[in-house]
Amino acid sequence: MSSISSAPQQQFSLRYHKASISYILPISSRYIYSADQSGLVIKWDLQIRRPKLQWQAHKDSILTILQWHQYIVTHSRDSTIKVWLEDILQFEMPVNALNYTNIVLYRDNYLITPATLDSNNVDVYKLKQHPIEVSRVIANISIFELVNKTRTNMHANKAGDGVDINVKYADEFAIDDKDNMQGRQDFGIIMKMLVIDMTIYIGFESGDIVGLHLEVPESKLTRGSNSTLLINREPRLKLEYQNTLLVPNPVISLANLNGLLVSGSTGTKVVIHSDPTRTVKFHLSGIHSIQTYQDRLVIGFWDGAIEYKGEIIQRPLPQIKGGLDINSNGDDENEEENLKSNVKLTSMTLSSFGNSSGSDTAKVQHVRKPKYSEMVKAKSMSDALFAGYEDGTIMGYALI
């Protein structure tokens, strides 16, 4: 009796990009946006598997696509952030752009970016819709200095100086362990950012991960006998969390697992930031992307492999077989190394719309066990894993 494979099942492919896929953003069960290293953006209609809209949004690789109300926000290595209504440009601003770092929205009206002056630091912008306005409210804040300052205050608190600081550290990271920070001048450049609930997580080149909370004080209204004064206090970032388990490997992937942070690096280790933290090791290195589905991890590796429920799928490059290589020196080991040619994974995301909880499938199970084809069909549009590759192809997979 053969068992059904739990590996992601290919449902369709989307082919139009000529350059490597750099970002994929699902906005509904029917539409996704994709971007590539040339700066092209495509809005896909998944019902017909064709582009509905396409435009040259930037002159270089697009690092981030965000949905902000009715707008689409794009962030590129050409050092600009642009706001679009469909393919019509509504707003543009200069911004620092690094090789990997994305930008994130916070509470839908703040934008967190790498700092313009220093790639290791952070800028925070406040967004307004009507008309679109962007104002910088926090400039060039050093997270490394914020961590050091908070640690100093925590030591003062332990000494009885009355400083009230509450920061969650990884269980392997003790407040009194000075070796964790001694001799280090910085965390390096920002590599990845992710917002979970009210916490902004930032992964650094050093392997450090920091969690921040953006405090937005309420405006204070002061009334006098002849006048009324509105006092606006500026937002500030407060340290909530730090983890050093991935040091010294750069953080290249962050994900949300039911409210818990999951992180991966250039190494083989994935950290689940529960209490206490859990570490999962894989046989492949380069944790390019982490997605979560029904309490399980979907791991995309640099070399193109995708692992889910212990099974791996890959897209091998076409190979010419049976020919005689007159230049071959008979070294089978080198020959095998040269044939290790999978299409490189460059972007991966999971869409969960409509039947994302699987409730419809659960109802059917009370009557009879659904056929595998029915399960795949039910989930192919609502729950889909989208994998973008260096050859410009986007593959749609169903997860069972």
From Swiss-Prot:
One of its GO terms (biological process) is chromatin organization. It comes from the Eukaryota. Its main location: nucleus. The keyword Electron transport does not apply. It is found in: Nucleus. WD repeats lie at residues 6-54, 57-94, 240-272, 273-312. One of its GO terms (cellular component) is nucleus. Keywords: Chromatin regulator, Nucleus, Repeat, WD repeat. SUPFAM superfamilies: WD40 repeat-like. Component of the ASTRA chromatin remodeling machinery complex. Belongs to the WD repeat ASA1 family. Component of the ASTRA complex involved in chromatin remodeling. This is ASTRA-associated protein 1.
